[in-house]
Amino acid sequence: MTGTVSTAVGCAVGIPVGVGVIVACLFWIRMQRRLKEEDIIDQELNRAVYDESGFVSFNNIDTLKAEPNGHPSSEDTNEVMHSSDIDDNGDDDDEDHNARRNNTYAAQDKNNGKYVPAYRRQINKHNSILQQQRKSRNLVNTMGHSIESLSMDDHSQANGKSRQVSVYDQMVPVLDDANRDSSSPFPTNDKDTSDKKSNLFQSHDVSANTSTSFFETRSNDNLIKNLNSHDFGSYYPRRPSTSNLNHSQGSLHTRNSSMLSLGKIENAENVFATPKSENILKHPHPLEHESSSISNETNNVTDNTIDGESASKSSKTYQLKNNYDIQNTSEIAEEDQYENEFTNYSENKRAYIDGLRPKM
């Protein structure tokens, strides 16, 4: 029984563990194969990038220029191909080697696994034909360009240990000049180019100076307009007003930050304050300023009412009717500005409450 139990436990535990290990090993082997394939693809990509044999050579940009007569004929092509096998000068070895390499590149790609598009093969073929045709027509230009290419090759070989130069490093944009002759690919006269550059810099400096002076004048004009249009501190009336608004006494001190309006606040009358008997007597209602005689009579009446108790009855000036004595201003902090003889809320409330009481 003991052996049977141990066998059953071992099978129940060992079989799933073994299956898991086998599956993990299979996945690991598959991942390693995928990584190896990716490494091979990366190596081929690097070789394709840094191998200039499969791309257009940008050392001689004249080779990309199309001839005015169009593509060369087949007879000229055959003659050029035949003449390319003969080395007339030792300086043309590099170009001959490049031409033969470009001619045989399309044939070699059939055996290689790397795919080359049709347009790339056509460009390489056309490039080799143009190089050979240009060499056969003008040996002097060919020698000059070969010297330049040799110097660039020597320079690349000298720096090859530090950094490997790719064909994409040679892709320098060339901008067309509108002033040059259309027949020549580049301006041949150095003096003309220097004169053009100097004229360009001079015009740039003149335009910069003009623009800066223009912006300075515009900024000064805008500053003057803003200063003239701004209203510095003229928020309060220049002469006292007779209108009574519902503002507290501290509303005049809300603009203490305005330095220009401080002088006006000290001298100006607080027109928003609670009307008192003295102010009312000094400033009667505007309706009674119809004539000078009425104003004189009002002043005389107010002078007489200050001494007697019948000042409010004899005076015809308009006064606010409050819930308290208007003379007792020291004990009362606030009042209702809209409470007058027609809207006496406290009196109306008192009358309403008295009306609710039972009559005896």
Swiss-Prot record:
Membrane topology note: Single-pass type III membrane protein
Residues annotated as transmembrane: 9-29
Protein location: Cell membrane; Bud membrane
Disulfide bonds: none
Compositional bias segments (type: Basic and acidic residues): 189-198
A GO BP entry: cell wall organization
Residues making up the signal peptide according to the UniProt record: none
Domain of life the protein comes from: Eukaryota
UniProt topological domain (Extracellular) ranges: 1-8
Polar residues biased stretches: 101-110, 292-316
Function statement: Plays a role in cell wall integrity. Affects the cell wall polymer composition in the growing region of the cell.
Protein name as annotated: Suppressor of lethality of KEX2 GAS1 double null mutant protein 1
Provenance organism: Candida glabrata (strain ATCC 2001 / BCRC 20586 / JCM 3761 / NBRC 0622 / NRRL Y-65 / CBS 138)
